[in-house]
Amino acid sequence: MDRELVMRFLGTGGAVPSKDRSHPGLLVEFSGTKLLIDCGEGTQRRAMEQGVTIHDVDAVLLTHHHVDHVAGLLPLATTVDLLHGRRLKVYGPTAGSESALDISDLEVIEYREVNPGDEVEIGDLRVLVYESEHGVPTVDYRIETPKIPGKADPKYIRRVPPSKRREVLLRGERPYSLTKPGKISVYVKGDGRPADPENVRGCQVLVHEACFEDHEEAVRYLHSTHLEAAEVAREAGVDLLVLTHLSTKVDPERMREEAREVFPVVVVARDGLMVRVRR
């Protein structure tokens, strides 16, 4: 089984894109399974520029239906239909009255509504759904791999019959295992007020929106700041915090330095960033 989950940040901007930051799009890959979280304008082109194929994704996970998160969905679904002759599987919350796209009327999309508390198995990944406060139906996603066996010690594993080795490594028995067994978990925060640290606990990586630097502005528009994201990361005990969905108004370098005063391991995402999470 693969021991690595890869996250590729296709778009890291806010509602207004810039020359450096496009509308949101995050590709998660593990053991042949591909999930695309949100699909803003131009997502296919950005993937091509980064040398990534997304027309073979297993599913798209929408955090909500604002236009900056869904404008690239119909073009991608059309590509999937033309190249593969199938409908694009899309999961997300109820569209609501502010939806930018009436997905239910699109023949090239197979839409499944998810709600907070739901769990979905997609390929080799398990997806848990949590509520986000954003004024419209919005969700966060916790993505987990299956349990990964401990890494074998070649000096000792030969003593175990081949048919028993996986069982031994899944238990993490010493001296046969060099590492403890476990799973990879990442939490992707949809637009909205800060994530609940209890929902994030146990994850290695927290991807959190940081649309604003100013707290009052974040509260007014139901978004989050970099400092609030850092507080969540500290309370949840993650290994890495990645800030994304940045407004054109913010200073990314200042945000990173200020966030590091609260939580030490912070990366401000940029379009093209790749994060590898190993077990």
Curated annotation (Swiss-Prot):
| EC class | hydrolase
What are the alphabetically sorted keywords of the record? Endonuclease, Hydrolase, Metal-binding, Nuclease, tRNA processing, Zinc
Pfam families, per database record: Lactamase_B_2
- Molecular function GO terms recorded: 3'-tRNA processing endoribonuclease activity; zinc ion binding
Q: Required co-factor?
A: Zn(2+)
What EC number(s) does this enzyme carry? 3.1.26.11
**Keyword Hydrolase appears in the UniProt entry:** yes
* List of residues binding Zn(2+) 1: 64, 66, 134, 191
Cite the cofactor comment.
Answer: Binds 2 Zn(2+) ions.
**Which residues are involved in binding Zn(2+) 2?**
68-69, 191, 245
Reactions this protein catalyses: Endonucleolytic cleavage of RNA, removing extra 3' nucleotides from tRNA precursor, generating 3' termini of tRNAs. A 3'-hydroxy group is left at the tRNA terminus and a 5'-phosphoryl group is left at the trailer molecule
Q: Which residues form the active site?
A: 68 (proton acceptor)
The protein's role, per its UniProt record: Zinc phosphodiesterase, which displays some tRNA 3'-processing endonuclease activity. Probably involved in tRNA maturation, by removing a 3'-trailer from precursor tRNA.
- Cited HAMAP family: RNase_Z_BN
The text of the family note is: Belongs to the RNase Z family.
Subunit-level organization: Homodimer.
Please identify the protein, giving its name as recorded: Ribonuclease Z
Species annotation = Methanopyrus kandleri (strain AV19 / DSM 6324 / JCM 9639 / NBRC 100938)
